[in-house]
Amino acid sequence: MTTFEEFESPSTSFNFQTFDRYQPDFKMIDYSHQQATHEYHLPDQEVFQNQNEFSASPPDISSPFADEKIYKSLPRNKCPSKCLVCRNPAIGYHYDVPSCNGCKTFFRRTIITGRKFTCAKQKKCMDGTEPVDMSKRLCRACRFAKCVEVGMNPMAIQAEVKTDEGKVLRSEVLNQRESLGVVSSLIVTEEDLLSRMIEKLTFVESKVEPLHRSGMPPGYRDIRKLEEILDSKPVLVVTDIPNLKFCPSPCANEKRPRRHFTNYVHTSYLASLESSKMFEFSSQLDLESRILLMKHATLICSNMMNAFFSINEMKSDILRHPDGSMSGHMRKFDRENDVMTDHVKLIQKTLITFLNHKVDKIEYLLFKAIMLCNPAVPGLDSWNQEIIEKERNQYVKALLNYCLLQHGKLQGPTRFATILAMAPIIENQSKNQKDFHVYIKAKHFQKHKKMGTTFRKCISCMFDQIMET
């Protein structure tokens, strides 16, 4: 068993008291202007208007479980939650807008007939946030005005407008749409915002996954410290890591050269660190706060990534490295050590939890973002805690909405609670792995002290900084 190869910190705090509505300007850092050789641009809301930036097909959100429902990334592939006109449950997209059957029919009939209505009150009959009482007679003037305001497109009506009044009204609506700047594709619903957040997280994951897969070349070591990694621009390819050091020399008292293996532990940690730098909130934190946060979150995110990769990519029910080798494989004499045996079982906990609850990729991405943004890490000041908590609340709200869309209003909250209940298991695994690291470090030091040297092999400086907190 490789002594430092498999290796978790303060308790996780969730704030469910208030959830602000999604921020339309939610975005992640664009590093494309800093590094010309790689594209790191993460699309914000404006970029989504450009169909050339992203194809119409949703990102890969496959899961190893064939019987689950998959939420399509594109909003039009999922029935919207409410009508934008009357705020009652919608039945689909009609004339480019999420709407109910009543409002759809009313808009079509009004355009075809060309009828015009007058409000007897103050033209505020459709104002408010609560669903309109459909059992009462609605103000037709305000209802039609609301249809136009939210972006219903008269040109999408298939029935022919034969009357002169209808043609005049259609022309007026089109002119009004232009003056209001109404663009139907920009109407933002909660489903649209969730889809955009999912696509952004999927994009980040796709950028760091090659780094996670590659592993450090045998014999090479990344000599950078944690603060150097966090304070530099993203490095998503192993060959771009600055100051790679080749360490071929074995211990002085060994009779034969030490066999070198691909170091997947370091690149797994590195993938978690590099992905964190792509979130906009990271740039709002000072370097000291980022170091504190990532000393806590790196191992957690790495464990989650390793577990989901083993399930989804390797189709395995045990933890495996990207080359297919078993993670935590013990040598013959290690099997007689209860501490080693318990550790091998320990590192499987996150994977077993994901398997038991059939976590799909979107749940994994959102949950990992929640675990990354932990304002309860000791040492953070109130200003930085507020930034992190605000970011976390967005992901918590997104996960809740996703669970409601996938499992309905009855089972959705239960599924949401089930996913969040995995947090203590993952946190405890991280803490126990760090305790094991201290045990191995002391044992290794004692061994080499008896040999007359304090030489100690380590995976990397960054690894030691994270594991020794």
Swiss-Prot record:
Boundaries of every NR LBD domain copy: 230-459
Keyword Magnesium listed: no
GO biological process: cell differentiation; regulation of transcription by RNA polymerase II; response to starvation
Domain of life: Eukaryota
GO molecular function, one term: RNA polymerase II cis-regulatory region sequence-specific DNA binding
InterPro entries cross-referenced by the UniProt entry: HNF4-like_DBD (IPR049636), NHR-like_dom_sf (IPR035500), Nucl_hrmn_rcpt_lig-bd (IPR000536), Nuclear_hormone_rcpt_NR2 (IPR050274), Znf_hrmn_rcpt (IPR001628), Znf_NHR/GATA (IPR013088)
Gene3D superfamilies: Erythroid Transcription Factor GATA-1, subunit A (3.30.50.10), Retinoid X Receptor (1.10.565.10)
Compartments reported by the entry: Nucleus
Keywords: DNA-binding, Metal-binding, Nucleus, Receptor, Transcription, Transcription regulation, Zinc, Zinc-finger
Signal peptide: none
DNA-binding region (UniProt annotation): 80-159
Entries under Pfam families matching the protein: Hormone_recep, zf-C4
Keyword Nucleus: yes
GO cellular component: nucleus
Zinc finger (NR C4-type): 83-103, 119-142
Similarity-based family: Belongs to the nuclear hormone receptor family.
Protein purpose: Orphan nuclear receptor.
Protein name: Nuclear hormone receptor family member nhr-154
Species name: Caenorhabditis elegans
